[in-house]
Structures are given as C-alpha cells and as structure tokens.
Amino acid sequence: MSKVVYVSHDGTRRELDVADGVSLMQAAVSNGIYDIVGDCGGSASCATCHVYVNEAFTDKVPAANEREIGMLECVTAELKPNSRLCCQIIMTPELDGIVVDVPDRQW
C-alpha cells in the first residue's frame, strides 16, 4: 500500500492508503472523496476526475496519452500544465506520498 493525499479546493486534506494497481479515481470514489466524481468509471471519457498533480510527482507519473489530453481540453476548471485525469494515474510504489489538488469544480 502506498499513500495518496487529496487536497480539496477548500484546503481539506485526506490521506488514503491505496493498493498498487488501483487508479487514484477508484481510490477517491471508494473512500468518499466527493470532489472527484468519475462518471465514466475510469475510461477517460468524462473529465470528472480532473486533478492537479503536485510538482514533486509530475515526472513520476506516466505521460498522458492522446485520449486523456483530449478530455483535459474539456475540463471546466482551469487547465494547468500539471492537470491530469486521476482515472489514468495508477498507483505504484514510486508514487507513494503523491499529493493531488482537486479543483473547485468537475462540471
């Protein structure tokens, strides 16, 4: 298990233990992180799991594929260089301690 910290737009921090192989979206939805919706169930087709990856981890997270990049263009919150869909971030030991900021809206 590795740690993930979700920081809500209001500054609330939730730390979760997440098993390797589980997406950050799955972990969030399963543990009541209500700011992350995940309507599509993890297929990168809805952009309701948009997060900002902490800069200390941007190089550790695999690059976004074309599908994810296309969906990121649809997000309603500000698009930043560290914007990602957390359904596409799969937990690995290298990501232990990752911090993601959740924007103020997913719609």
Curated annotation (Swiss-Prot):
InterPro entries: 2Fe-2S_ferredoxin-like_sf (IPR036010), 2Fe-2S_ferredoxin-type (IPR001041), Adrenodoxin-like (IPR001055), Adrenodoxin_Fe-S_BS (IPR018298), Beta-grasp_dom_sf (IPR012675). Residues 2-106 form the 2Fe-2S ferredoxin-type domain. Its cofactor is [2Fe-2S] cluster. GO terms for biological process: P450-containing electron transport chain. It comes from the Bacteria. Binds 1 [2Fe-2S] cluster. GO terms for cellular component: cytosol. Disulfide bonds: none annotated. GO terms for molecular function: 2 iron, 2 sulfur cluster binding; electron transfer activity; metal ion binding. PANTHER family: FERREDOXIN-2, MITOCHONDRIAL, FERREDOXIN/ADRENODOXIN. Belongs to the adrenodoxin/putidaredoxin family. The oxidation of camphor by cytochrome P450-CAM requires the participation of a flavoprotein, putidaredoxin reductase, and an iron-sulfur protein, putidaredoxin, to mediate the transfer of electrons from NADH to P450 for oxygen activation. This is Putidaredoxin. The gene is camB.
